[in-house]
Amino acid sequence: MATERLVAGNLHNEDQELELSLRPRCLAEYIGQEHVKETLGIFIQAARERGEALDHVLLYGPPGLGKTTLAGIIANELGVQLRVTSGPALERAGDLAAILTNLQPRDVLFIDEIHRLPRQVEEILYPAMEDFVLDIILGKGPGARSIRLDLPPFTLVGATTRAGLLSSPLRDRFGINSRLEFYQVAELEEIIRRAATILQVAIEPEGAREIARRARGTPRVANRLLKRVRDYAEIRAGGVITREVAREALELLQVDAAGLDSSDRRLLLTLIRKFNGGPVGLETLAAAISEEPDTIEDVYEPFLLQMGYLQRTPRGRVATPGAYAHLGIKPEDRLF
C-alpha cells in the first residue's frame, strides 16, 4: 500500500521515534522554507513583545515538508505549551470543547489534517477562533438552551495537504497562511548531514548528495532513506556512506535517480501502456493500479506533477514527454 512506501511523504509508525530525535526546536535550526521562516519569525517576535497570542496559522503543502515541526517551533518560540490533535480524532463537538477549555493563555493548539474535521466540530471553531468564546448547547428540542464560555486567547495552527478542501469560513479565520514548498537538493543535503551527525552516521558529502537527489524534495523521505542506507552501509560497506554505497543501497530499494519508486513507475507505465498516455479519469486510473483516488491525489501526484511527469487536464491525467523519457519509452511505443 502507498502508506508503506519508502518514498511516501506521509508518516510511518516507524518514523515517529526518528522524527522526534531529529526535529529542530527553533527557527534557527529549521532548514529550508526561508520565506515561511522569515515571515513567521517576524509575527512571532511581534506577538511575544506585545504579550499577545499569535494570529491563527494555516500551514499547507504536500506531506513530509515540516508542518508538524513548524507547529512545535511556533510554540517553543512563543514559550507556551503545544496541544496536538488531528481532524479525524475530533469526532464530536465535545472532543474539541474539552481541549479548548483546558488551554492556557497564548497556548498553541495544533490540528493536523484539519480539512478532515467533521462539520459540527468545525462550526464550534468559528467563534472560538474569532472571539475566543465557546457556544455550548444544553439539552435538545424546544427546551435546549445555549451558554457561552470565555476562552483564553490561543493560537490555532492548522495543517493540511489539501487546502482546497477547507471551507471558506474556516480558511478566512486564519490570519497567517503559509505554503510549504518542496526542498532543493542543497537544503536536503544539509538536513541529511545534520541527521547523520545526530545519529552518529559516517557519511561523505557525495553520499549525502546522492540521498538528497532521490529524496523527492521531502525531508521526511530524506531521513527515512538515510536510515535505510545506514543499514546497508553497516552490513555491506564498513559503515561509511559514500556516493557509491548510497547509490547501491537506493537501487536495491528500487528508488531511482529521480526519486521514483516501483509504485510511481507502475502508475506511469499503467497510464502509458493501458491508456495510451491519457487522458484518463482519476477513478479509472486508481482502479487500474488498485489504489484509492485520494491516495493518488495526496501521495503520488504532488511529486510527479512537480517533476513534470504527469499533467492534470479537464479530461483526466496525462503522461508527459518527460515521463516517456524517464521510463525509456518512445511515444510511438505506447501504441499497440
From Swiss-Prot:
Molecular function via GO: ATP binding; ATP hydrolysis activity; four-way junction DNA binding; four-way junction helicase activity
Location within or outside the cell: Cytoplasm
Region (Head domain (RuvB-H)), start-end ranges: 257-336
SMART domains in UniProt: AAA (SM00382)
Binding positions for Mg(2+) per the UniProt entry: T68
InterPro entries linked to this entry: AAA+_ATPase, AAA_lid_4, DNA_helicase_Holl-junc_RuvB, P-loop_NTPase, RuvB-like_N, RuvB_C, WH-like_DNA-bd_sf, WH_DNA-bd_sf
Region of interest (Small ATPAse domain (RuvB-S)), ranges: 184-254
Coiled coil region boundaries: none
Enzyme class at the top of the EC tree: hydrolase
Region (Large ATPase domain (RuvB-L)) residue spans: 1-183
Comment block on domains: Has 3 domains, the large (RuvB-L) and small ATPase (RuvB-S) domains and the C-terminal head (RuvB-H) domain. The head domain binds DNA, while the ATPase domains jointly bind ATP, ADP or are empty depending on the state of the subunit in the translocation cycle. During a single DNA translocation step the structure of each domain remains the same, but their relative positions change.
Function recorded in the entry: The RuvA-RuvB-RuvC complex processes Holliday junction (HJ) DNA during genetic recombination and DNA repair, while the RuvA-RuvB complex plays an important role in the rescue of blocked DNA replication forks via replication fork reversal (RFR). RuvA specifically binds to HJ cruciform DNA, conferring on it an open structure. The RuvB hexamer acts as an ATP-dependent pump, pulling dsDNA into and through the RuvAB complex. RuvB forms 2 homohexamers on either side of HJ DNA bound by 1 or 2 RuvA tetramers; 4 subunits per hexamer contact DNA at a time.
Family from the record: Belongs to the RuvB family.
Protein name (Swiss-Prot/TrEMBL): Holliday junction branch migration complex subunit RuvB
Gene source species: Moorella thermoacetica (strain ATCC 39073 / JCM 9320)
Gene that produces this protein: ruvB
